[in-house]
Amino acid sequence: MKRFSKFLAVVALLGLFSGCAEKYTELYNLTPDEWYAQVIADIKDGDLEAADKHYVSMASEHVASPLLEQILLILAQAHANDEEYLMANHYLDEYIKRYGDNGPKTEFAQYLKIKANFDSFTQPNRNQKLMEDSVTEIEKFLYMYPNTEYRPLIETMLIKFKLALYFLDMQIADLYNRTGRDVSAKIYEQKLEESPFRNSDLIKPDVAWYRKLFE
């Protein structure tokens, strides 16, 4: 009886795997236009996992298809809209690697990467280094593309990142003072003294997401 039960379990498992395999073998040898339509349909259905898999199939079957360039940007934006910012940046990095021209295409993709990082800070528990890296990336972007059409948006992001870091430094200094770590507190107090925001009339946020770092 036990052997029969095990046999049924194995058969059921094989049937499950067969069903899964059959599901994905349905989509092979499609034209670039058909793959493109399938990825768009996946995105519309909210199934980004399927969209990712179908993109991989499309890219492997049609390496030189001009539709790949567009679909990479579409997937990046879809993941950003779904707050999957790491995946968004993955596709943007792939876009730059494949189609970067050190001109408008690269500039646009780099802008989207910065925007994805900026949008990710609407979530709590983001780390200080990621903010500092974002400031560095923005300053590098502005140096590389001084006449960029995205300058107003980029500069707004830069100011907000720097403000967030300033308030975060205030929180860290306060934390160190309250826990008796005077040397560390003085380091952050010195940073605050040297900040261009020091004498600014700033409205302190009531509930700052970066407080979650210490909770």
Predicted features, each with a name:
Residues E61-L67, K97-T106, N125, E139-T156, ...:
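Short solvent-exposed coil/turn linkers within tandem alpha-helical repeat scaffolds
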Residues L14-Q38, A50-D52:
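Bacterial Sec signal peptide processing site at the extreme N-terminus
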Residues M1-C20:
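Sec-dependent bacterial lipoprotein signal peptides
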